Amino acid sequence: MVQQLVFSEPRPGKPPRHLADLDADGRASAVAELGLPAFRAKQLAHQYYGRLIADPRQMTDLPAGLRDAIADTMFPILLTAASEVTCDAGQTRKTLWRALDGVTVESVLMRYPHRNTVCISSQAGCGMACPFCATGQGGLSRNLSTAEILEQVRAGAAALRDDFGDRLSNVVFMGMGEPLANYARVVAAVRRIVAAPPQGFGISARSVTVSTVGLAPAIRKLADERLGVTLALSLHAPDDELRDTLVPVNNRWKIAEALDAARYYADVTGRRVSVEYALIRDVNDQPWRADLLGRRLHRALGPLVHVNLIPLNPTPGSQWDASPKPVEREFVRRVRAAGVSCTVRDTRGREISAACGQLAAEGG
């Protein structure tokens, strides 16, 4: 039986307004409401996006009285770190965040030799009900606000600077939630992530990835935003019969519709689409499915696609496990034989439940 999809948040949350919720015009209006001179808007944005400071009491170039005045009105504490765990010799760090209304989400900071990536959540929980994903099995609590999303980015960037003397280079919307089901807030967050300081964090659009299970109309809408970010389509099966079960949204938008939307995205943006495929033993790893995947992707996207094979990560209560390595290698060979680029993704954080499909926001 297909678990019910949830596209609207069961418990809508409205966190207090934060500077990060506002664009340049909104910041100007907020500053004017407080009776402050217009230049303060740019100054506050520089503190947040440029210096990564979210506590006005640390904004030493502001008058002391002003710091107190804006603490609650423009810089409420939206997320509090409830716990942190690390693995990979400290190179992977998972943070459990608690919001003001008590919901919890997780983000993961990963350091690599030539890049630093933060994997962020866009919703508390997820309504897409994928049976192999811990987040999907937990259901959806609510959407995150733009500022709650951006606070995960700011915290990751600040941790890299303060703990490692390093910079954040990549942001991936691959944490908890379906980003395109929280479309307006996610797009607003992306705009702030890629904008140069003091309007945003200044991360290259090419280094930002937005993942989706295949909300075809929203993929097309995102293409028309012309943000230039990477689209990652979580496919996980090349045939509708299996994908209807593994990715229940397929019952609304079939593979052909998702691939048509992905092709539209590639054509409009000029960006290669990433296809995510969690390899599950004896479920979706058969040679004929590798052949079918290669053929369908080559026909739909030509050279504008890359397949990331993901060894299935264990989740509580799941009866499935990862495909054996020889099966994995043969799957890669067959997809490549169809003329499609394919690699196995480096899995980080499995032992601390921080890898793909494992985030459940438990504990803390």
Swiss-Prot record:
Residues annotated to bind [4Fe-4S] cluster: 126, 130, 133
Protein's cellular compartments: Cytoplasm
Residue ranges of every copy of the Radical SAM core domain listed in the record: 112-351
GO-annotated biological processes: rRNA base methylation; tRNA methylation
Keyword set includes Methyltransferase: yes
Molecular function per GO: 4 iron, 4 sulfur cluster binding; metal ion binding; rRNA (adenine(2503)-C2-)-methyltransferase activity; rRNA binding; tRNA (adenine(37)-C2)-methyltransferase activity; tRNA binding
Enzyme Commission code(s) on record: 2.1.1.192
Recorded catalytic activity of this chain's protein: adenosine(2503) in 23S rRNA + 2 reduced [2Fe-2S]-[ferredoxin] + 2 S-adenosyl-L-methionine = 2-methyladenosine(2503) in 23S rRNA + 5'-deoxyadenosine + L-methionine + 2 oxidized [2Fe-2S]-[ferredoxin] + S-adenosyl-L-homocysteine; adenosine(37) in tRNA + 2 reduced [2Fe-2S]-[ferredoxin] + 2 S-adenosyl-L-methionine = 2-methyladenosine(37) in tRNA + 5'-deoxyadenosine + L-methionine + 2 oxidized [2Fe-2S]-[ferredoxin] + S-adenosyl-L-homocysteine
Active-site feature positions: 106 (proton acceptor), 356 (s-methylcysteine intermediate)
GO cellular component terms listed in the entry, alphabetical order: cytoplasm
Similarity comment: Belongs to the radical SAM superfamily. RlmN family.
Note: Reaction proceeds by a ping-pong mechanism involving intermediate methylation of a conserved cysteine residue.
Designated name of the protein: Probable dual-specificity RNA methyltransferase RlmN
Lineage: Bacteria, Bacillati, Actinomycetota, Actinomycetes, Mycobacteriales
Gene: rlmN
